[in-house]
C-alpha cells in the first residue's frame, strides 16, 4: 500500500493534540533540536498540533557543532522559542571524573554520554517550564536499536515512532520543512561516521525490509535480524523479577 503522507501527518497531529489533552492540557512541548530530519519534522508536527507558542526548542551543542546552523534554520523557520545549552563543559568534567575513577573509557561510552546529558537537560528545562519532553526516534532506528537508552530513546511521548525514514521525509515535505533539513545525512555527531556507515546498510534497504519483508542480500538480512532481536529490550519497560512467594 502506498504511503499517504497527508493522511499520516494529519493523524499524527491529532494524536499529539489528544495526548496533551490527557497528559498536560496546559503544558508546553520540549524538544531537542539537532538540525536533523527527525527533530525538525517532529518539531513541525508539534507546532501544527499545539501552536508555536507551546513548543520550546533546545539546541545542545557539545562545545562546538559543525551543523548548528541547521538547528538554527529550523527554529527560525518555525518561529518557536528556543534556547541554547552547551553541554561541552559538563561532558568534559564528567568524563574527566570517570577517567580519574576507572581509567580508560570506551569509545561507545564517549559517544553515548552526550545523548544522555542532552536528555537530562531537556527534562530539567521541562520541569522548569511546565513541559513534556518529545521523543524523536523513528521506526527504522527503533527497529535496529539505533538509539541511546536513556538518551535520545527517552521521552514522554513519541510522535514518529510508527514511521520509517522514507515516510518521515514524505511527512516533512507535507509540512513544508526546508528540504535541506529533510535530506540531511544523519550521523551521531561524534564518531565522524554516518548512521548508514555504522549500521552497515542503507535506510532504504532497511525501510523496504520493514514494510515488505523483502531484502536482496542475505547477509544484510541476518545483520538486521540480529540487531532487531538484540535491541528489543530498548523498547520494553525494564525487565523485573516478580516474586510470588
Predicted regions and their residues:
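ATP/NTP-dependent adenylation/nucleotidyl-transfer catalytic domains that generate, transfer
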Residues: 1-31, 53-56, 63, 72-90, ...
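Extended, folded domain segments that form the structural surfaces/walls around functional sites
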Residues: 39, 60-62
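Catalytic-core regions of hydrolytic enzymes
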Residues: 116
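Conserved G/P- and acidic residue-centered "switch" motifs that form tight phosphate/ATP-binding loops
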Residues: 36
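Short, well-ordered alpha-helices that flank and scaffold nucleotide-derived cofactor binding pockets
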Residues: 44-48
Amino acid at each position: 500500500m502506498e504511503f499517504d503522507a497527508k493522511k499520516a501527518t494529519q493523524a499524527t497531529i491529532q494524536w499529539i493534540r489528544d495526548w496533551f489533552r490527557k497528559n498536560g492540557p496546559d503544558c508546553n512541548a520540549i524538544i531537542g533540536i539537532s538540525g536533523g530530519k527527525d527533530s525538525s519534522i517532529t518539531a513541525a508536527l508539534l507546532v501544527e498540533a499545539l501552536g508555536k507558542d507551546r513548543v520550546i526548542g533546545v539546541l545542545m551543542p557539545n562545545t562546538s557543532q559543525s551543523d548548528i546552523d541547521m538547528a538554527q534554520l529550523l527554529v527560525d523557520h518555525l518561529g518557536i522559542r528556543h534556547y541554547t545549552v552547551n553541554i561541552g563543559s559538563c561532558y568534559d568534567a564528567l568524563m574527566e571524573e570517570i577517567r580519574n575513577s576507572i581509567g580508560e573509557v570506551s569509545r561507545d561510552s564517549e559517544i553515548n554520554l552526550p545523548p544522555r546529558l542532552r536528555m537530562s537537560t531537556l527534562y530539567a528545562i521541562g520541569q522548569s517550564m511546565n513541559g513534556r519532553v518529545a521523543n524523536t526516534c523513528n521506526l527504522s532506528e527503533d527497529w535496529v536499536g539505533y538509539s541511546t537508552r536513556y538518551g535520545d530513546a527517552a521521552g514522554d511521548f513519541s510522535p514518529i515512532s510508527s514511521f520509517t525514514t522514507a515516510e518521515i521525509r514524505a511527512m516533512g515535505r507535507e509540512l513544508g520543512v526546508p528540504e535541506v533539513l529533510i535530506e540531511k545525512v544523519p550521523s551521531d555527531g561524534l564518531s565522524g561516521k554516518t548512521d548508514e556507515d555504522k549500521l552497515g546498510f542503507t535506510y532504504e534497504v532497511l525501510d523496504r525490509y520493514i514494510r515488505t519483508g523483502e531484502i536482496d542480500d542475505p547477509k544484510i538480512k541476518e545483520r538486521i535480524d540480529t540487531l532487531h532481536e538484540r535491541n528489543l529490550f530498548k523498547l520494553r519497560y525494564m525487565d523485573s523479577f516478580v516474586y510470588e512467594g
